[in-house]
Curated annotation (Swiss-Prot):
Function, as annotated: Produces ATP from ADP in the presence of a proton gradient across the membrane.
Region forming the signal peptide: none
Organism: Chlamydia pneumoniae (Chlamydophila pneumoniae)
Top-level lineage group: Bacteria
Name the record gives this protein: V-type ATP synthase subunit D
Amino acid sequence: MSVQVKLTKNSFRLEKQKLARLQTYLPTLKLKKALLQAEVQNAVKDAAECDKDYVQAYERIYAFAELFSIPLCTDCVEKSFEIQSIDNDFENIAGVEVPIVREVTLFPASYSLLGTPIWLDTMLSASKELVVKKVMAEVSKERLKILEEELRAVSIRVNLFEKKLIPETTKILKKIAVFLSDRSITDVGQVKMAKKKIELRKARGDECV
């Protein structure tokens, strides 16, 4: 339902102020949209790279799959997949807070160097790398999701400003301006007619004297 606009000088002033605010804020929104588009592209590349690293780490650990069941290795192998802590933080990108991983700490695996196979170190290193790469891949996807959502929201606002708010406000201003102009012309005409009537009355009065 359309909002009823008062065709007054005060309404004209308010709508003019509104249009000025919209036109001032639109370039800022457009700049943010451009920055977000660039950051989304970077985030897409980063997510793809992290996912690739995770797949490669998975393939490396898969090569040891048959060795996981060896009794001497079971406990330390299981430990190598356990996360002790994740140092998360946030950074501001184009006005948006996105997560970032500073460090992933896993529980240390204790085992006897003499009582375990020589390849165990390599396998444990590969398993830890898999866990870290998985965390990094998940966070990179979350970063991408947040940036894409913000870009969508900003794009909607830019479109709203350009296609609706600014054109509608401009249209309202023109409508009020035309009305006020017509009324001004009418008022001037009425004043002139009133003056003529007064002059005619005076002229008739002079004739009667």
